[in-house]
From Swiss-Prot:
It is an enzyme of class 7 (translocase). This is ATP synthase subunit beta. It is found in: Cell inner membrane. Produces ATP from ADP in the presence of a proton gradient across the membrane. The catalytic sites are hosted primarily by the beta subunits. Its EC number is 7.1.2.2. SUPFAM superfamilies: C-terminal domain of alpha and beta subunits of F1 ATP synthase (SSF47917), N-terminal domain of alpha and beta subunits of F1 ATP synthase (SSF50615), P-loop containing nucleoside triphosphate hydrolases (SSF52540). It catalyses: ATP + H2O + 4 H(+)(in) = ADP + phosphate + 5 H(+)(out). It comes from the Bacteria. GO terms for cellular component: plasma membrane; proton-transporting ATP synthase complex.
Length: 467
């Protein structure tokens, strides 16, 4: 095992000098020998003259020049397999839940090749979420990649928690949750909610259904940059065993941001909006590995923060290209008090095709979108001239669109605590029946307020009797 010496420390980036013939390879893990606690460096560049530039996987406080560093000769490797279930780990795969060490038989390196074309498989099997607006307008595919796009405070994490609740609890498979640069409180809430739901079993961890990997907001950029790969590596191991895995990543934007933080320190010229020049490649390396093979599938749900609500920002724009379904959250819908604040006109899915979802579903979804689009166009006229100036046909469109907007809302299980309304899971056939009736004009005489926060159309009719 070769050793070197620290020669320079710039925040999260450290230069280490090795003897000329024994320079570590890029992505090799190095251990700092004299550090108070375990500290790992990951090689990013070979500068020349035996010096390598590394990212610190932890806090660089207390490091000084001249400390001895050992080369492990291999990339960072993390525990994989059933021993990780029910546990909370950090970027290095060390347990941080105070329930003892993880004695896994197998460890995988976090840097791995994406599956080849021959190994990949594509599926058109739909994944029902029980959320009306998603199942109708942007249906998810089993083994697909889903992105939840939204600015600050419009409900990305709540929507993700509801999807975990509806999919992970109904689906008997395993899940991996990667918390990338998000609030520690949310990770804590998630852990305790999973315990209450029986998905995490502290007494018998091997009976748990979820593994959690956290690198939160307060962590150095090295942790946030690599923690998504740690979670993905664990999910890949379950997939290769022939299981169907759910991978939840909250938040993919922080992964990009961590790359931006270290990029300048590594001496790269910034590109558009100050992002790293390697943005597309870094995103591709992660996303290409999140895929389904002939052995098993990985269905991933990723929250994507949209800076300043600008979907053309390079980070969300780069993410768009990799996804099968995009769920776009809209601040204006949230401001109207309509939750989930998912925009049915902006959200898209490759599965919304008559050959996949069937002609009836396709027609209902497009009918809902065209009604809402027409209402959007008429809003300016209504604002200036009022409703009275519209033709009878347009008045009918406006009335139906307002009912559709209200009927797209529904109470969430995870929001019960602060709304007081019990959550509702709506099967797809009930969703289609409700919207089909609304488009056909079967409920033109029902007051629009009856459609707010109800599940099936029958619930709305019950509510209307009480109004």
């Amino acid at each position: 095992m070769t050793t070197g010496k620290i020669v320079q420390i710039i925040g999260a980036v450290v230069d280490v000098e090795f003897p000329q013939g024994e320079v570590p390879r890029v992505y090799d893990a190095l251990n700092v020998v004299d550090a108070q606690e375990r500290l790992v460096l990951e090689v990013q560049q070979q500068i020349g003259g035996g010096v390598v530039r590394c990212i610190v996987m932890g806090s660089s406080d207390g490091l000084r020049r001249g400390l001895t560093v050992e080369n492990t000769g291999a990339p960072i490797s993390v525990p994989v397999g059933t021993k990780t279930l029910g546990r909370i780990m950090n970027v290095l795969g060390d347990a941080i839940d105070e329930c003892g060490d993880i004695d896994a038989e197998e460890h995988y390196a976090i840097h791995r090749e994406a599956p080849s074309y021959e190994e990949q498989s594509n599926s058109t099997e739909l994944l029902e979420t029980g959320v009306k607006v998603i199942d109708l307008v942007c249906p998810f595919a089993k083994g697909g990649k889903i992105g939840l796009f939204g600015g600050a405070g419009v409900g990305k994490t709540v929507n993700m928690m509801e999807l975990i609740n509806n999919i992970a609890l109904q689906h008997s498979g395993l899940s991996v949750f990667a918390g990338v640069g998000e609030r520690t409180r949310e990770g804590n809430d998630f852990y305790f909610e999973m315990q209450e739901a029986g998905v995490v079993n502290i007494e018998k961890p091997e009976e748990s259904k979820v593994a959690m990997v956290y690198g939160q907001m307060n962590e150095p950029p090295g942790n946030r940059l690599r923690v998504a790969l740690t979670g993905l590596t664990m999910a890949e191991r379950f997939r290769d065993e022939g299981r169907d895995v759910l991978l939840f990543v909250d938040n993919i934007y922080r992964y990009t941001l961590a790359g931006t933080e270290v990029s300048a320190l590594l001496g790269r010229m910034p590109s558009a909006v100050g992002y790293q020049p390697t943005l597309a490649e870094e995103m591709g390396v992660l996303q290409e590995r999140i895929t389904s093979t002939k052995q098993g599938s990985i269905t991933s749900v990723q929250a994507v923060y949209v800076p300043a609500d600008d979907l053309t920002d390079p980070s969300p724009a780069t993410t768009f290209a990799h996804l099968d379904a995009t769920v776009v959250l809209n601040r204006n819908i949230a401001a109207m008090g309509l939750y989930p604040a998912i925009d049915p006109l902006d959200s898209t899915s490759r599965q919304l095709d008559p050959l996949v979802v069937g002609q009836e579903h396709y027609d209902v979804a497009r009918g809902v979108q065209s009604t809402l689009q027409r209402y959007k166009e008429l809003k300016d006229i209504i604002a200036i001239l009022g409703m009275d100036e519209l033709s009878e046909e347009d008045k009918q469109v406006v009335s139906r669109a307002r009912k559709i907007e209200k009927f797209l809302t529904q109470p969430y299980h995870v929001a019960e605590v602060f709304t007081g309304d019990p959550g509702i899971y709506v099967p797809l056939k009930d969703t289609l029946a409700g919207f089909k009736g609304l488009l056909a004009g079967d409920y033109d005489d029902v007051p629009e307020q009856a459609f707010m926060y109800c599940g099936k159309i029958e619930d709305a009719l019950e509510k209307a009797k009480k109004l």
